[in-house]
Curated annotation (Swiss-Prot):
One cellular-component annotation, GO: cytoplasm
Protein name: Clustered mitochondria protein homolog
Biased composition (Basic and acidic residues): 958-969
Ranges for the TPR repeats: 1020-1053, 1147-1180
Biased composition range(s): Basic residues: 1258-1269
Organism for this UniProt entry: Kluyveromyces lactis (strain ATCC 8585 / CBS 2359 / DSM 70799 / NBRC 1267 / NRRL Y-1140 / WM37) (Yeast)
Compartments it resides in: Cytoplasm
PANTHER family registered for this protein in UniProt: CLUSTERED MITOCHONDRIA PROTEIN HOMOLOG, EUKARYOTIC TRANSLATION INITIATION FACTOR 3 SUBUNIT EIF-3
Classification via InterPro entries: CLU-central, CLU_dom, CLU_N, CLU_prot, GSKIP_dom_sf, TPR-like_helical_dom_sf
Assigned keywords, A-Z: Cytoplasm, Repeat, TPR repeat
GO biological process: intracellular distribution of mitochondria; mitochondrion organization
Residue stretches making up the Clu domain: 297-552
Similarity-based family: Belongs to the CLU family.
């Protein structure tokens, strides 16, 4: 046993077996506390349903926070006595609610906001991947015939689906995994307990109905549960004699229902065979809320949902007090840090949940403002100790910089800084929890208030003019101590606060400066307040980041036409960090030295206040425009970074690189300029090749003439000797020597291809994101003009029908409008399709400084699936569509209708329009408070750094080994035998370090799971990175396991069709192939291929990558026919990408197809493809290029073989005709091949046959280029 562990023995636990010994033993760390022991007991079969019990050590009931090491003292073991404890109302309710979770009343789709939005299901298990077969890592694996058959079937299904559009049904998720094992379990109508029975220990009454329709009434008492004699019409809480009372409710239910235990076992078995990541309820995040939902919630009757609030005896929470109290906790160990982060993560999630619930109540007019006299966006609400205010320029604060538009930007920027503070965990300065909730076009800012700010301090009794006493509220004692005070419109200074804010300014690189003779270490727009708890709070942090002054000067200040909507354009935190890192690196200073240098800090008020400037702020803005944006885009165009799959991926890349989305227009213009440059460069190159080809043809003509002349002259000389009867001199018998100056050595051109998939793909994704954002702004603007949120679905359906339903019904109308509303008062209803399309162009120009063509809709229909734009709009505005067939043309509808059963066809009601308000619901779009685990991140960085260090050491060791081998081959001294033992020691040391690194990475993930729970977005990236680590080590089996986990979590956290999920599945396909599971790999590729139809433009390189990997897998099966089918599909895709232009990658692919046909002895098809390749190589590389000459030689060889085969066939026919009639070939025996030398040869062998042994290397090089277009 480790010295850091303690043996813990729990005695007296209930036993369900005949065994007398029911002791439970654990080895737990000394730093663990009693609550950890309770967690372990909750997984034991005998104690998992016990929620009310004491643990007694040395006759003392221990507290959950007691540390095991402190209880044990110098001892190495601890013994606890397990003792059930009497229930009270709170613990009884907790027991019942907890049991309901176990019994399946809470499905895997439920989270804290399920009443407002539908969560994403999972599809990963539906792929039915075969279990990991533990194939040997890195070694050759044998593929069974059965697996080959299944692979070929899946491969053919994928190939057949290539020319079909995205199928919306492919996103449907299966049935729920977690389903109730009871029909109902809720508090009965006889609650609350009458006073007479309260004295008898009764706490509450329950009613349970089994799946077999048996109903039982149950009494909950301090000693447990028993079935009583009550019925639906009679109250009698006395026990029924035939059933024994039980301490746990589940034991009672098992007793009264014969099939209940069977249902529970069935549910347990179902869950135990599934990864817990698929069904466990999230503890500190919300599940993904998809744009497409498979089905509407069943909403089975469950009284308990409405009853729980009544039995909730928790006092109203004060999130601010709790949040600040957590920061005050002492941290003396890693366990303390872990505990602190876990509490913080849970609190922040609970805050986000309450923020959403409160916001939705306000959106639905269910709450009263603090001042009942205010209405609309002027109203401020106080609910569950949180402040809710609409994001709008109500007081005119931002009127000079954009009004409401500026207010929207300020809210976003404030939240970004607050989330940075959540991560930093500063103690000297405090901040308020904040969230932003968007719903139906309106935005609410939710904050936990500064303590005392809204707390009434009493009233003054005054006498009014009529001599009546009136109670007048006293003003709060809390006011601004530092920074800008709105009430008096002046800047304030406080020495104590000035010192406290120093920690904040250092972390955000803010320069101390003067504004109106007041010294400040923060923005003059921010404010500092001492709460009644005497903690220093900082508010209004939006202007902490510097102004993007280059953008302001170009698009706002002194701009008269098409001015940007607001001046509140700031640089992102990522950009500031990157600028500072580069400046420090260039200076050669250490981080410690740089922290004291004013060269690396900035004035947050620069260019905010007239006349205030800062060189560093201007330099950062220039750095973004001149360096970061261009390097980021060039990185994508050069293939160093993947082209984004969709708008969300694009946004993630922009923000990670510190680029704001307002630069979308500039990004497209940059990409288009580079695209045009490549086109021109290619045109010049092709012109050069064309000229060189003419010169080569001229040389070839002259060369042939010269050779013919030499041959003729030689023949004439030989003839002279022959005519004279003399012996021909040996000199004349030798090969004719040509002048080297007359020869033309072959060249090797690289070609000049335009990366069409890179350029067109990036432009397409950027424009689609711009269009979707522009439409979101139109939706928001029009929604704000509506008198009721119930009208917003009408607006959404109307606009979607205008855009997408034109071919189904040109006369778009507002359907099913309630009689309370007048259609003539609805501004959106007056829009035409042309006006809407033009308005999108206006918004794109205004917000992204880009001129969309008036045909943008038609252009994007050619670039993407129709559903790509619908998806993008839905995600941004919070629309959840039902996954069903939508009809965009009459022809599509009639085809669908004819496919239905004849009996049903007559009952079908023709839809009036493509979309109806019954096809979707609206959900809140949440930008919540975020938290990151620093302790888990530190462990991860340590582990990853160690992995990288070991990898470098292994590369160096391998290099030395190769050098040693080379030296030995050259006859030099390769070193003494002692060197081998040294290498072995070094290898052992590296293995030890690697194990240590992997342990650190595993511990980091374990900490994340402890802090955030088993379902959280941070775990998705962690498991994916861990999978990549194991992949680098060649341990594919483990890599696949972790990648599977990442995929499952990604589906639940991000969605089944998110770019994160697609990226993970793409990795998984490679890993499955790497470990030899070709069927699994094909299944995953099939899923990726279908998702790419929805997410990405048709020209996206991800589609090419799917076929590349599929071809690699097919090659391992040695089925050349399926390989040919794959490459033919790839050729089709390459032509589609280039607009039918036959480019070099297409030629290389045709050459590969020719290889395969040759190996099948199908010379006619081989000739067809090699001729096509030769023609392309001639145009792209030149007639004198080695590749072109090789293909030409190959073509001639194949032609010769075909001619020979034809001659042999004629000869065989002639011989057959002369044979006696009774002599024939044996039935069923095929004639031997005419070209046995080529039959069934590999591609490399064929090239060696044609070109010699050097061919295979060049072939392999050419294969790598086939993705370039």
């Amino acid at each position: 046993m480790s010295a850091d562990n303690i043996e813990v023995i729990v005695k007296g636990t209930p036993s369900y077996t005949k065994s007398k010994n029911s002791d439970i033993k654990y080895q737990l760390g000394k730093e663990s506390n009693v609550s950890h022991l309770r967690t372990f007991l909750s997984f034991e079969e005998s104690t998992k349903f016990y929620t009310s019990y004491d643990l007694i050590e040395n006759s003392r009931v221990v507290d959950d926070e007691d540390v095991l090491g402190d209880l044990a003292g110098n001892g190495s073991s601890l013994t606890f006595q397990f003792k059930p404890k009497a229930y009270n109302l709170v613990t009884a309710v907790q027991h019942i609610v907890g049991l309901r979770e176990t019994l399946g009343f809470s499905s895997e789709l439920e989270d804290g906001i399920s009443e407002f939005a539908i969560s994403s299901g999972s599809q990963f298990q539906d792929m039915s991947l075969e279990p990991n077969s533990e194939k040997s890592n890195g070694s050759e694996t044998t593929i069974s015939d059965q697996e080959k058959v299944k692979f070929l079937q899946t491969c053919n299904e994928l190939l057949e689906s290539t020319n079909t559009d995205f199928n919306i049904a492919s996103l449907k998720t299966g049935n729920l995994l977690v389903t109730p094992v009871l029909k109902s379990l809720h508090f009965s109508a006889y609650n609350p307990v009458p006073a007479f029975y309260k004295n008898k220990g009764h706490l509450l009454y329950l009613q349970a109905s089994t799946l077999e329709n048996e109903t039982f009434h149950i009494t909950t008492s301090i000693s447990g549960f028993y079935v009583n004699k009550s019925s639906s019409v009679k109250f009698d809480p006395s026990p029924k004699d035939e059933f024994e009372p039980k301490f746990n409710l589940i034991d009672l239910l098992t007793q009264v229902s014969k099939k209940f235990h069977q249902h529970v076992t069935s549910l347990r078995n179902k869950l135990s065979s599934t990864d817990s990541a698929q069904y466990v309820k999230p503890a500190s995040c919300f599940l993904s809320k998809p744009w497409l939902v498979s089905q509407l919630p069943s909403n089975n009757g469950d009284f308990m949902r409405t009853q729980l609030e009544h039995f909730n005896n928790d006092d109203e929470r004060n999130f601010c007090d709790e949040f600040q109290a957590i920061k005050d906790l002492e941290i003396n160990s890693s366990y303390d840090r872990l505990k602190n982060e876990k509490i913080t993560a849970g609190l922040i999630h609970e805050f986000n949940s309450e923020a959403v619930k409160g916001a939705m109540a306000i959106f639905n007019n269910e709450l009263t403002p603090i001042d009942p006299g205010t209405t609309g966006e002027n109203a401020v609400y106080f609910h569950k100790s949180l402040i809710f205010s609409f994001v709008a320029d109500v007081s005119g604060t931002y009127s000079s910089i954009g009004g409401n538009e500026a207010a929207y930007a300020v809210a976003n920027q404030d939240l970004q800084i607050i989330n940075s503070l959540n991560r930093l965990g500063l103690k000297g300065i405090r901040h308020c929890l904040t969230a932003i909730i968007d719903y139906a076009g309106h935005r609410l800012l939710v904050q936990s208030p500064v303590p005392g700010l809204l707390t009434p301090v009493g009233v003054n009794i005054i006498v009014d003019e009529e001599d009546k006493e009136v109670a007048e509220p006293m003003e709060t004692l809390i006011s601004v101590n530092y920074g800008y005070d709105d009430f008096v419109a002046t800047l304030k200074f406080d020495e104590k606060f000035h010192e406290k804010v120093c920690e904040f300014s250092k972390n955000f690189y803010l320069k101390e400066h003067k504004v109106e003779e007041v010294d400040l270490r923060i923005s003059s727009k921010s404010k500092g307040i001492f709460g009644v708890d005497q903690r220093a709070y900082i508010l209004d942090l939006a202007n902490t980041n510097p102004v993007d002054i280059e953008f302001v000067k170009a698009h706002y200040d002194d701009v008269k036409e098409n001015k940007y909507p607001h001046r509140q354009v700031l640089l992102r935190r990522e950009l500031v960090e990157r600028w500072r890192a580069e400046k420090i690196a260039a200076s050669g200073k250490t981080l410690q030295e740089a922290s004291e240098d004013v060269s690396f800090i900035y004035n947050p008020d620069a260019y905010v206040i007239d006349g205030v400037e800062d060189e560093n702020v201007a330099d950062m803005s220039k750095f973004l425009n001149d360096t970061v944006l261009t390097l980021f885009l060039e990185d994508i165009l050069k293939g160093n970074s993947n082209i984004p799959y969709d708008g969300q991926h694009l946004t993630d890349l922009f923000h990670t690189n510190g680029v704001n989305m307002r630069y979308l227009g500039k990004a497209i213009e940059f990409v288009k300029a580079k695209y045009e440059d490549q086109k021109q460069e290619r045109a010049k190159y092709l012109s050069k090749i064309e000229q060189e080809n003419k010169e080569y043809q001229d040389w070839e003509t002259g060369y042939l003439v010269k050779v013919e002349k030499l041959i003729k002259e030689r023949q004439e000389e030989i003839n002279k000797y022959v005519q004279q009867g003399k012996e021909v001199p040996s000199k004349l018998k030798e090969q004719i020597q040509l002048d080297k100056a007359d020869l033309k050595e072959p060249v090797r051109n690289e070609g000049c291809t335009v990366e069409v998939d890179q350029f067109e793909g990036l432009i397409a994704v950027c424009e689609l994101e711009m269009i979707a954002r522009s439409i979101k702004h139109i939706f928001r603007q029009q929604s704000k003009k509506l008198s009721s949120p119930t009208l917003v679905p009408h607006l959404v359906a109307f606009f979607l029908n205008l855009l997408f339903g034109k071919s189904y019904n040109e006369s778009v109308t507002v359907e099913n409008l309630d009689a309370l509303f007048d259609i003539n008062e609805l501004e959106f209803a007056q829009y035409t399709r042309e006006q809407l399309i033009e308005e999108v162009r206006v918004q794109a120009k205004l917000r992204f400084r880009y001129d969309l063509t008036s045909e943008w809709f038609d252009i994007n229909e050619k670039r993407f699936s129709k559903y790509a734009l619908i998806r993008a709009i839905a995600q941004k505005f919070g629309i959840q569509l039902i996954n069903k067939e939508y009809f965009f043309t009459k022809e599509q509808y009639e085809k669908w209708k004819q496919a239905q059963d004849k009996k049903l066809r007559s009952k079908i009601v023709d839809p009036k329009q493509t979309f109806s308000i019954n096809d979707f619901s609206l959900r809140p779009v949440i930008k919540g408070a975020e938290f990151q685990s620093l302790i888990a991140e530190e462990l991860w960085i340590q582990g990853a750094s160690l992995v990288n260090a070991v990898s470098v050491e292994e590369e160096e060791a391998e290099k030395k080994k190769e050098e040693s081998k080379k030296a030995a081959a050259d006859g030099e001294d390769a070193g003494s035998s002692g060197a081998t033992s040294k290498e072995e020691e070094q290898a052992k040391e590296r293995a030890k370090k690697m194990n240590e690194a992997l342990t650190l990475l595993g511990q980091s993930i374990a900490f994340r799971e402890d802090i955030f729970g088993l379902v959280h977005p941070s775990l998705v990236s962690s498991y994916l990175l861990l999978s990549n680590m194991y992949s680098r080590l060649g341990q594919y089996s483990q890599a696949v396991t972790f990648c599977n986990k990442a995929a499952l979590l990604s589906e639940r956290c991000y969605g089944v069709d998110s770019f994160e999920t697609v990226r993970i599945l793409s990795n998984l396909a490679y890993l499955e192939y790497g470990q030899g599971s070709i069927y699994n790999s094909a299944l995953v590729l099939k899923k990726v291929h279908e998702l790419l139809k929805l997410l990405a433009p048709f020209v996206h390189s991800g589609r090419v990558n799917v076929f590349n990997l599929l071809f690699q897998i097919a090659a391992s099966t040695e089925d050349k026919k399926v390989q040919i089918k794959i490459l033919n599909k790839l050729s089709e895709l390459l032509l589609k990408i280039t607009g039918s232009e036959e480019t070099l990658p297409y030629g290389q692919n045709e050459s590969r197809i020719a290889n395969l046909y040759t190996s099948l002895d199908d010379m006619s098809h081989a000739l067809s493809h090699i001729e096509k390749a030769k023609s392309i190589f001639s145009k792209e590389l030149g007639l004198n290029d080695q590749t072109t000459l090789t293909s030409k030689q190959w073509s001639e060889t194949i032609k010769g073989i075909i001619t020979k085969q034809q001659q042999e066939k004629k000869l065989a026919s002639a011989q057959q005709a002369t044979k006696p009639a009774n002599i024939s070939q044996k039935k069923g025996k095929k004639s031997s091949s005419s070209s046995p030398a080529l039959t069934n040869k590999s591609v490399d062998e064929l090239l060696q046959f044609i070109e010699g042994p050097g061919a295979s290397k060049s072939s392999k090089k050419s294969k790598k280029k086939h993705t370039k277009n």
